């Protein structure tokens, strides 16, 4: 849960609430949300034995430390909230963090409706193709990758004035809709794909300048949203 959201917190102190992850507990469900205004990560998880609803913001730095303590095979984690603190009981370890003050923004309105294009793609192939294409983008100092869809293929390209252009193609499955061109930050995209623990990724595009969504195929528990970059 932490690894799938914490990477998207803001590192800027201009809006302190965005340096934390919003934990919303209601109706036996935990919804974790993190955003730095350029991307958004959401993870949903069913809970047991919830005594009351909560809406708190936990500092991203504290969650990063907690993640180091937790091992993958821990059966249960007990969580206790006080007015301005949270306690995690992990095995024999008690981990206490302060809570951030303020109201977390309503991020549900960021999600567009009615996609123009939807497709499925192999997570590993997509990730490594972006990684290869981003080498030139990083050389150019901008991290921008251009993506175009069409005929069951996704084409990725990046350009460096000094070196030239690199192009990568990845096969897409279950393509709905026409063709589209969009640009994005390669690091944001790779972070999002890494957070999706699934071999197949579903991508929904809503327009060249609208946010696009990634999630595991057939699973709504993890959602990654990325804002595009204007290049076209």
What label would you give each PLM region?
Residues 1-44, 48-100, 115-232:
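DNA polymerase processivity clamps
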Residues 110-114:
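Bateman (tandem CBS) regulatory domains
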């Amino acid at each position: 849960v932490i690894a799938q959201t914490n990477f998207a917190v803001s590192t800027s102190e201009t809006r302190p609430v965005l340096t934390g992850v919003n934990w919303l507990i209601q109706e036996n469900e935990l919804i974790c949300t993190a955003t730095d205004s350029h991307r958004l990560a959401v993870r949903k998880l069913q809970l047991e034995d919830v005594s009351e609803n909560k809406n708190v913001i936990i500092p991203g730095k504290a969650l990063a430390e907690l993640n180091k303590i937790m091992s993958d095979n821990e059966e249960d984690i007990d969580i206790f909230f006080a007015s301005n603190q949270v306690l995690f009981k992990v095995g024999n370890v008690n981990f206490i963090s302060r809570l951030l003050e303020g109201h977390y923004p309503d991020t549900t309105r960021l999600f567009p409706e009615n996609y123009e294009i939807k497709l499925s793609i192999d997570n590993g192939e997509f990730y490594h193709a972006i990684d290869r294409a981003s080498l030139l983008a990083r050389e150019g100092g901008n991290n921008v990758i251009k993506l175009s869809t069409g005929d069951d293929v996704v084409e990725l390209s990046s350009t460096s004035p000094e070196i030239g252009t690199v192009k990568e193609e990845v096969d897409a499955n279950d393509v709905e809709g026409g063709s589209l061109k969009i640009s994005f930050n390669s690091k944001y995209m790779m972070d999002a794909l890494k957070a999706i623990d699934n071999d197949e990724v579903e991508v929904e595009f809503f327009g060249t300048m609208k946010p696009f969504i990634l999630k595991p195929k057939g699973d709504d528990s993890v959602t990654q949203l990325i804002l595009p970059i204007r290049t076209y």
